[in-house]
Amino acid sequence: MAGKPVLHYFNARGRMECIRWLLAAAGVEFEEKFIQSPEDLEKLKKDGNLMFDQVPMVEIDGMKLAQTRAILNYIATKYDLYGKDMKERALIDMYSEGILDLTEMIGQLVLCPPDQREAKTALAKDRTKNRYLPAFEKVLKSHGQDYLVGNRLTRVDIHLLEVLLYVEEFDASLLTPFPLLKAFKSRISSLPNVKKFLQPGSQRKPPMDAKQIQEARKAFKIQ
């Protein structure tokens, strides 16, 4: 029997968090090996474990997969979370890219220089409220199902829930005008595997704090 997937990243959300979410939603147990120093990262590189000398990297089914989208696609396909046909997969990909844009826009605020933070925060709030959330509210209304694509859970439902929780952390009032998204958040959060991942003590990571930012900058040699 194959062992658990092993996730290589630092002990924070970053680009690995959506992978953690997807594995958890699929009911897959996984291990994590945290990068805590530049030496940890260099060892992975020198041992030939990182195809492009970067993380995230996931060991799964005898492979060492790099690149977030490739990892997500493999997990979604393996655990039947990638739609039933090409049209559904195209919608899943399109929606996922928009969700990724929103996730990165919010996530990068913590790294923003102080003199730019106010302007970028205002821009992020504007785009969240007037571009991204209305788009997904419209999808839920027009599709008329419990899920974004088709009539069963797919990876994009998990990605959307994740970013809705980030939006809630960022500014909970941004969700107020979107009743279908609020209902979606409650519905997907209640799924057994997701509910378990949302409980204290899971491998879900909290928002990055100043200490984690400093550790990440050190590990990745970011000035």
From Swiss-Prot:
Induction: Induced in the liver by beta-naphthoflavone (BNF) and 2(3)-t-butyl-4-hydroxyanisole (BHA). The keyword Magnesium does not apply. GO terms for biological process: glutathione derivative biosynthetic process; glutathione metabolic process; prostaglandin metabolic process; response to bacterium; response to caloric restriction; response to stilbenoid. The modification N-acetylmethionine is found at M1. It catalyses: RX + glutathione = an S-substituted glutathione + a halide anion + H(+); prostaglandin A2 + glutathione = prostaglandin A2-S-(R)-glutathione; prostaglandin J2 + glutathione = prostaglandin J2-S-(R)-glutathione; (13S)-hydroperoxy-(9Z,11E)-octadecadienoate + 2 glutathione = (13S)-hydroxy-(9Z,11E)-octadecadienoate + glutathione disulfide + H2O. One of its GO terms (molecular function) is peroxidase activity. Keywords: Acetylation, Isomerase, Lipid metabolism, Oxidoreductase, Peroxidase, Transferase. Glutathione binds at Y9, K45, Q54, V55, Q67, T68. Pfam families: GST_C, GST_N. The keyword Transferase applies. The modification N-acetylalanine is found at A2. Residues 85-208 form the GST C-terminal domain. Residues 3-83 form the GST N-terminal domain. It comes from the Eukaryota. Expressed in the liver, skin and kidney. Its EC number is 2.5.1.18, 1.11.1.-, 5.3.3.-. InterPro entries: Glutathione-S-Trfase_C-like, Glutathione-S-Trfase_C_sf, Glutathione_S-Trfase, Glutathione_S-Trfase_N, GST_alpha, GST_C, GST_superfamily, Thioredoxin-like_sf. One of its GO terms (cellular component) is mitochondrion. The modification N6-succinyllysine is found at K4. Disulfide bonds: none annotated. Belongs to the GST superfamily. Alpha family. Homodimer. Glutathione S-transferase that catalyzes the nucleophilic attack of the sulfur atom of glutathione on the electrophilic groups of a wide range of exogenous and endogenous compounds. Involved in the formation of glutathione conjugates of both prostaglandin A2 (PGA2) and prostaglandin J2 (PGJ2). It also catalyzes the isomerization of D5-androstene-3,17-dione (AD) into D4-androstene-3,17-dione and may therefore play an important role in hormone biosynthesis. This is Glutathione S-transferase A1. The lineage of its organism: Eukaryota, Metazoa, Chordata, Craniata, Vertebrata.
